[in-house]
Amino acid sequence: MMTVTDLLHAEELPGLTLLTHETNLDAPILQANILENPDAFDWLTPGEILLTTGYIFKDQPCLQKRLIQELANMNCAALGFKVQRYFNEVPQEMIQLANDVGLPILSIPYNYNFSQIISLVNRRVNQPDETISQHSVHMHVSYTHLRAHE
């Protein structure tokens, strides 16, 4: 399992910055997705981190607020916002609303590709849980040992 805190501290992605209060940082990230389409609200799923440049809501404060509210309502893990592309910084209104609803917003440095973040999330989410793997091996060895002594 990967959490928002894990992503913020990932050695592979130095420079990710938390812009909101330290709320819901233990939220599990189940997948990463790119949000560059205003119709995408219909396809959001809980546990996603949504990555955006902000292009779809550049000059639309109402859509910026709707985005934060929709992500919070869907229990999305976080919003990753790539700055220095269409926005020099994340609008304060978005940060304030995200604080109010408990949605973490991460600032993504301009030089990062979204694929770097998606790849890391996919690797971490899909890697086998070491504890479960070790327990399975232990059970198999115990079972084999019992069968050998029957």
Predicted feature descriptions by range:
Residues 1-147:
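Alpha-helical/coil-rich non-catalytic "connector" segments in signaling and regulatory proteins
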